[in-house]
């Protein structure tokens, strides 16, 4: 039985969503991140790769890097670029490229499920990278990067998601330079939130996976 809960996301205002959207922190090197950051002051890489805003050559694990990540995140919130939802929600996230669509739902998985085996691990990870992300999350007091989990969706959950998409307008709908269109819907009705939670409670296991042909959570 999987625990998957709604939460209050800290997310970009609609008119800045395309600017805030950024590549994962570990697919760009220091120079690439710096170039993106210099060209776009709203890029979330200022939080994920904050060394771009410090002196060249600083050690990636220097305490000042983590402090800068928190400062940059707080500054984006202070300026109203990022705003937190007032109630806990689920978020439908859709990616479209060259006619192919991949749809998932964003929520909070349980660390206890990771420990008790409900979340299935796919590979060994490097301890230095783990400690870096733990320190980053602790410093920002925020989960700054998504974890992808794959599962076999119950038909009722798929139906619920499709009905929500067709009856509600996406809060974000933009296409990036890589020709990938991003769309997000916010599920904010208590009865529907309860139904989503119950559907996940009937799922035996989730698979931790950075990439998968399956639908992603």
Regions found by a protein language model. Give the residues of each.
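A cross-family signal for N-terminal binding/gating loops and helix N-caps
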Residues: 1-206, 213-217
């Amino acid at each position: 039985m999987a625990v998957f809960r709604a939460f209050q996301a800290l997310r970009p205002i609609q008119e800045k969503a395309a600017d805030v959207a950024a590549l994962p922190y570990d697919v760009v090197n220091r120079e690439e991140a710096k170039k993106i950051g210099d060209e776009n002051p709203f890029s979330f890489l200022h939080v994920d790769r904050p060394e771009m805003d410090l002196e060249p050559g600083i050690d990636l694990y220097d305490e000042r890097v983590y402090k800068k990540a928190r400062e940059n995140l707080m500054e984006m919130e202070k300026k109203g670029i990022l705003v937190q939802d007032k109630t806990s929600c689920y978020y439908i996230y859709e990616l479209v490229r060259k006619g192919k669509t991949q749809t998932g739902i964003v929520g909070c998985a349980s660390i206890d499920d990771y420990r008790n085996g409900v979340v299935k691990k796919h590979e060994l990870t490097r301890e230095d990278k783990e400690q870096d992300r733990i320190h980053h999350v602790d410093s920002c007091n925020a989960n700054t990067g998504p974890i992808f989990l794959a599962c076999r969706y119950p038909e009722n959950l798929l139906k619920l998601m499709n009905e929500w998409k067709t009856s509600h307008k996406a809060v974000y709908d933009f296409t990036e330079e890589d020709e990938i269109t991003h769309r997000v819907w916010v599920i904010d009705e208590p009865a529907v939130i309860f139904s989503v939670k119950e559907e996940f409670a009937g799922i035996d296991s989730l698979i931790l996976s950075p990439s998968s042909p399956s639908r992603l959570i």
